[in-house]
């Protein structure tokens, strides 16, 4: 039986899928190997590797100009790669051909529409282009417009807000039931309410498709993503499940808060490793002073401790660490 699992693991690696616990495989919906792209003398992608598991919500993180949009346009076959390979649902992407795009729904950062149409008219138009039947177009359009909160919207698209256009763009991208939904900076120009609406929709469609969205808004990623990748200087430095990455980079730093400033001063006089971080708060590393020593002193001296907790790594701290290396 052990030999069987070993063989399955080898096959999974060969065909860009992930080994599952029961000896089956979980497919990588998107697999990129050694992707390279140059514009003149400027090298934008320098051997990028990326694996996006099926039914994940995958955050593709990078600062402006890092190459996120270039990567996405290459996945769509709109840009010709200078090297490397891209597989979508196991099929190779070829520049200038659209075969693999039948698996993909795409939402650009600024979607464009025919302003004189209503939302149902626009989805009907898109459905006819893709060869859907009229019955399927009507059923799917109603389903998606309800999903994105536009089910009762009768106005023409020209009066839509930016957030409404983004939501319509998601509906259009999902119309043909794609296996992979690619969103390029979908929340970058939205207000907090609009951002929440888009993020809620992306989270809701996870059971239907795999979501890859690029962003530099790290709080959005922490809110909905199951997996992430950090793009910096043309390569992916870190990628994997968000929970695993946070666990891997967990520190031994703690923060505590006292009821009074005088109580914090007393603690800092006794424990030299405490560093003040606020009016009544201080941080420390466990190897400087154990939790037991501090808690015993707090108890013995009747210090009112409001909280003491481990400092969990944030995506911001991890990303800055990657960028500054």
Model-derived regions, located:
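Short, low-complexity segments with poor structural confidence in diverse proteins
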Residues: 4-5, 15
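Conserved catalytic Walker-motif region of ABC-type ATPase nucleotide-binding domains
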Residues: 8, 32
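Short, Lys/Arg-enriched N-terminal segments with co-localized hydrophobic residues
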Residues: 12-26
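ABC transporter nucleotide-binding domains
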Residues: 28-30, 37-232, 238
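ABC transporter nucleotide-binding domain
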Residues: 197-285
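Short, charged/small-residue-rich alpha-helical element at the C-terminal edge
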Residues: 252-325
């Amino acid at each position: 039986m052990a030999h069987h699992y070993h063989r399955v693991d080898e096959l999974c690696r060969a065909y860009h899928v992930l080994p599952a616990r029961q000896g089956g495989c979980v497919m990588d919906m998107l697999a990129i190997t050694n992707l390279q792209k140059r514009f003149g003398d400027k090298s934008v992608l320098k051997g990028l590797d990326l694996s996006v598991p099926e039914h994940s919500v995958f955050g593709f993180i990078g600062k402006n100009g890092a190459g996120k949009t270039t990567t996405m346009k290459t996945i769509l076959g709109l840009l010709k790669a200078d090297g490397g390979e891209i597989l979508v649902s196991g099929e190779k992407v070829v520049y200038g051909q659209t075969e693999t795009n039948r698996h993909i729904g795409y939402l650009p950062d600024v979607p464009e529409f025919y302003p004189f149409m209503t939302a149902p008219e626009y989805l009907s138009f898109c459905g006819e282009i893709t060869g859907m039947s009229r019955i399927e177009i009507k059923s799917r359009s109603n389903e998606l417009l309800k999903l994105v909160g536009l089910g009762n919207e009768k106005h023409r698209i020209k009066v839509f807000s930016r957030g409404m256009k983004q939501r319509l763009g998601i509906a259009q991208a999902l119309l043909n039931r794609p296996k992979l939904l690619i969103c390029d900076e979908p929340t970058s120009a939205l207000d907090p309410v609009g951002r929440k609406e888009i993020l809620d929709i992306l989270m809701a469609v996870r059971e239907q498709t795999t979501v890859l969205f690029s962003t530099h808004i790290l709080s959005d990623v922490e809110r909905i993503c199951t997996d992430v990748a950090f793009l910096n200087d043309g390569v992916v430095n870190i990628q994997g499940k968000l929970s695993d990455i946070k666990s891997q980079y967990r520190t031994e730093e703690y923060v505590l808060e006292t009821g009074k400033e005088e109580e914090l001063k007393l603690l800092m006089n006794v424990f030299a490793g405490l560093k003040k971080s606020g009016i009544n708060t201080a941080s420390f590393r466990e190897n400087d002073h154990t939790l037991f020593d501090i808690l015993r002193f707090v108890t013995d001296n009747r210090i009112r401790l409001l909280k003491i907790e481990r400092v969990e790594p944030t995506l911001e701290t991890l990303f800055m660490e990657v960028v500054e290396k």
